[in-house]
Amino acid sequence: MTLDLASALNDLQTKKPLVHHITNAVTINDCANITLCIGAAPVMAEAPEEVAEMVAMAGALVLNIGTLSKSQISAMLIAGRAANDLEVPVILDPVGAGATMLRTESARRLLTELQVAVVKGNAGEIGLLAGAAGRVRGVDSAGLDGDPVAVCKSLVNAYSCTVAMSGATDIVTDGDRVVLIDNGDPRMGVVSGTGCMASSLTGAFAAGSRDQVCSTAAALAAFGLAGEKAAKRAFGPSSFKVALMDEVAALTPPVLSAGAKIRIL
C-alpha cells in the first residue's frame, strides 16, 4: 500500500473546500485560521436553525465537543444528519471524553446517531470510547492501558469509522490499513489549540476524498511537519504558534511528500 500525500494536498488546494465547524469557544479562531492556512475556507456556524443549510454548502463537517452546551449538541446532531444525507464527511474530535459524563455521553451519542467518517482524539479519549482503560485529565490524555493500534481498531469495529489517535507517533487506521506518522515537535503540546487545529486540517483534507485513511494521514503529517519547521525558528510558545500557522500556509505538495515521516504496517 502506498499513500499519495502530495496529491491529497494538491486536491485540497485546488478545490478550496468549505469546512463547516461546530467547535469550541477556546480555539475557534485558531481553527478558522489554520483552515485558511492550508487552503480551505472555514465557516463556524452553530445555530441549530441554520446548520443544515450550511452543511449543504460544505465539503466536510468538523464537530468538536470542547465547550459543550445543549444547544450545541442539538446543532451537531442536526448538522450531522444533514451531512450524512448529503454524503459530506463528518469529523469528530471528542475533546475531553472520559473527563465528565456530559462529554462521554455526548461523544457516544454522536457516534451512535451519526455516521462519523473520522474520529480524531488523543490516547485517553480514543481509549475511553473504545472501552479500553483510557485516562483523561481535563481535556488532555493521562495515558492508555493496552496496545494503541488494537484500541484504535476496536473503535473502528464499534462505529465503522476511520480512527486517528494523536501522540508522539500518530496512528491512523480503518481496521485493515494502519499508518504511523512520526512528524511533529514537543512544542505542539505546550500551546493550546493544536489538537483542535489538527482536527480542522483533517476536515479540510477529508472534503471530497474517498480515502479517509490517506486524507487523515496527510492532514496529520502536514501539521506535524509544519510543527517541526516552526520549532526551528521559534523561541517561545507565542512565536511557535505564529510560526506553526505560517509553516502550514507555506506547505506545498512536494514539500509534504519529501518531509512526511510515515510508516505503513
Curated annotation (Swiss-Prot):
It catalyses: 5-(2-hydroxyethyl)-4-methylthiazole + ATP = 4-methyl-5-(2-phosphooxyethyl)-thiazole + ADP + H(+). Pathway: Cofactor biosynthesis; thiamine diphosphate biosynthesis; 4-methyl-5-(2-phosphoethyl)-thiazole from 5-(2-hydroxyethyl)-4-methylthiazole: step 1/1. Catalyzes the phosphorylation of the hydroxyl group of 4-methyl-5-beta-hydroxyethylthiazole (THZ). Keywords: ATP-binding, Kinase, Magnesium, Metal-binding, Nucleotide-binding, Thiamine biosynthesis, Transferase. Its cofactor is Mg(2+). Disulfide bonds: none annotated. The gene is thiM. It holds the Pfam family HK. It is an enzyme of class 2 (transferase). Its EC number is 2.7.1.50. It comes from the Archaea. Belongs to the Thz kinase family. This is Hydroxyethylthiazole kinase.
